[in-house]
Amino acid sequence: KQAGALLLSLAIIGGTVFPAGQIRAAAETKQPENSMKAATVSDAEKIPGTTVPGLLSRRPETMGKKRSSGGEVYVSASSSNARWDSGAGTEEDPYISLAYAVDQAEDGATICLMSDLTETKSARFWDKDLTIDGQGHTVFRGDGFEKAQDLARGGYHPAMIEVGGTRPGEAQTASLTLTDIVLDDGGKTEGVNFKQASTDGKGGNESLVQDAIVATYNGTAEIILASGATLRNFGGMSAVRLSGGDLVMEDGSQICDDTNGVADRTKEKGDYGAAGAVWIQGGSFRMEAGAEISHMRGRAVYLDGGSAEIGGSISDIRSDKDMWQGGAGAAVHVRNEGTAVLSQSGSIKGIAGESTEHTVIDTVIGDFEAVSGSEISGCRDIMVASANDQGKDYVHKMLLNGLISDCTTKGSLMRSWYAEITVGPTGQVSGCTATGAGGLLYTNNGSRYVFGGKITGNTAPKGIVYLANQSGGRVSARMLEGAEISNNKGLGIKVNNGSLLTMEGGKISGNTGAGVEVKGKTDKKGAAFIMNGGEISGNGSYGISYSNAGESVVELNGGTVFGNGSRAQISVTGGNSNDKNEFIHIKPGTLAGNREIYLSAGTMTLDEDYQEVWLG
């Protein structure tokens, strides 16, 4: 009865008691129920000095022994001790088990490895700050890794190391620092299903693979991967699981698969799939310059709420349909109000696509910013960026102020769906190729682009920017002062299917096709181009190519159109218009130099001092 009352009034994650209702919804994903009952907890299973149930299913028999004194604790597989919970933790008489060492170590201690270790028991601790100095050694996940148990999850497969505090809502009370060490999962899985464990106390989690190599669950701990720390070959859902709390990857730290092969984390039918190397559900992740996530199949960062600042390098990742959310965001996937920033020192390079529909960066109800100085380059057969704001309210943004270069795809380089993508004033997209039907930068249903930077030297036969509303809200794009869409192979901007392009400034020049193509359609009305400033010049075809159908409109209120390659600067096709909402409007001075306009009925040339012109 007491256990039942406890489960009704409290929720417990990672050995920590939370007031009911304060656990993030993302951590409460329900799984199919089974007959497993919540475990009872004896006094021996409680964290010392508290009444709080812990994650350990059985505390060491040596609980009452004097713990190792001093600031260093030693562990060696070559110890003469036979029992996992024996030894004094000294250089002369080291512990044999990392799990026992972290339990026995005092707050502030450094655990020093004297040899490689193969562990079959999770090393878990609470309310302590511990450093594990591998001294160049590796800790391997052994076969038959023991299950753990708590009231929230019942029996489950744990991470190699779990850290947390017992006082949620307070300042962080625990930390783990890893230095000069390799933790190697060996691509092994305990359990078979790639799903998030349920935390409703009903169990049913023993078939699920482990969450991570290293994990924290309740917002009270910090994990620091210091120089020389490597997490390798994660076999479960992630290498690091962060449900609240903080993760820092310092210069010289790494998460990767080894050179002997890249693990293929294949999910069963109905599974979510693995999350990624770093799996964040709340809390914060800071990846410093010199840190690296590389050489793996799947995903680098899965940000399900919380924040990530990426100042290190993400490279050599191949997307995989078997990941959670499939191939969306092989480098960074942001959702559930998460915010990710690729900082000045951050780079994403060499991401490859299993499918051209897969993406390097993907946001779903979340924000992403690449700041000036950041770089995304060398990506192959994959879309670089996709933004999806499912609330259709444009609250979430994708701001690109860094460099995107040398990326190729048979699809489009970017895409949005009810979202806004901004190429900021320092943003550059250059040297990229997209041969798909949607051009280089594609937008769909209710989406927006804002161009303030430079899009130069790219190749896209269907257009550098392709605006099209296929079945939803109106698509729009704005071009600002200082923006450039220039010297590309292909037309500059295609305005299709009722879309709107507004040019406030900037330059569309030197492209091999037309500067702007406005394609009116009777079944998808309202395509419009409004030019209030800037210039359209030096393009290989018409400055403006306009098909007057379906209440399409071109208004040249300011700026100039001049020096384009075709004999006429403007082409108007589609025959005579009998609709007052279908026209081209040219104000004085907006058409300069050669002032020819090609019409279905013939060619006309405006006088040098022409007055306002309306055609339609």
Regions from the language model: what does each represent?
Residues 1-7:
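Bacterial Sec-dependent N-terminal signal peptides
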Residues 8-16:
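Hydrophobic core
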Residues 26-100:
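Right-handed parallel beta-helix/beta-solenoid
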Residues 78-83, 116-118, 136-138, 183:
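Acidic glycine-/aspartate-rich tracts in secreted/extracellular proteins
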Residues 118-131, 140-180, 184-224, 237-245, ...:
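Extracellular beta-strand-rich solenoid/capping regions of secreted or surface-exposed proteins
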Residues 130, 135, 178-181, 186-187, ...:
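Solvent-exposed loop/turn tips at the surfaces of repeat/solenoid architectures
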Residues 158, 203-213, 237-240, 271-278, ...:
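Glycine-centered small-residue motifs that form tight turns
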